[in-house]
Amino acid sequence: MTTTKTVREISETYFTAWQAGDFETLRELLAEDVDFVGALGTASGVEEALAGLKGLGRVLEKIEVHARVVEGDDVITWFDLHTSIAPPAATANWSHVENGRITRIRVTFDPRELLAAMGR
């Protein structure tokens, strides 16, 4: 029997997998043509998106979710991004889901302290 995950469950799984470094699960959640735009860059397609997630994943310590709002196929997650190199960053992530996969991601946060810690 096949079960279909809800948009909320897909979002929850995305953040849990990213925090755990489970990039195979992330690959299954992302559409092949996923489009990502964030404070640190952009990515077109699943390979570029995974590369970006892996890059930030090297310093990721914890994702502390404060709220998740779902409306139709859209979900906004408000969280603190804890890294090993900068103070926690309050972050908003909007994702759009189609046919059980994340097709678009937009992320916003103040990247100044993280960029400074990265020497950029």
Segments the model singles out, each with a brief description of its role:
Residues M1-E28, E32, G119-R120:
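Short, low-complexity N-terminal intrinsically disordered segments enriched in polar/charged residues
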Residues T3, A51-R120:
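A beta-strand edge to alpha-helix "cap/lid" segment located at domain peripheries
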Residues T6-I10, E48, D74:
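Charged catalytic carboxylate motif
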Residues T13-T16, A39, A92, R104:
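Short, flexible active-site loop motifs that bind/organize anionic cofactors or intermediates
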Residues Y14-F15, F36, F79, F109:
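Aromatic side chains
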Residues A17-G21, V37, V97:
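Residue-level signal for short amphipathic helical patches enriched in basic/charged
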Residues F23-T25, A31-E71:
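A solvent-exposed, acidic/Ser-Thr-rich amphipathic alpha-helical stretch
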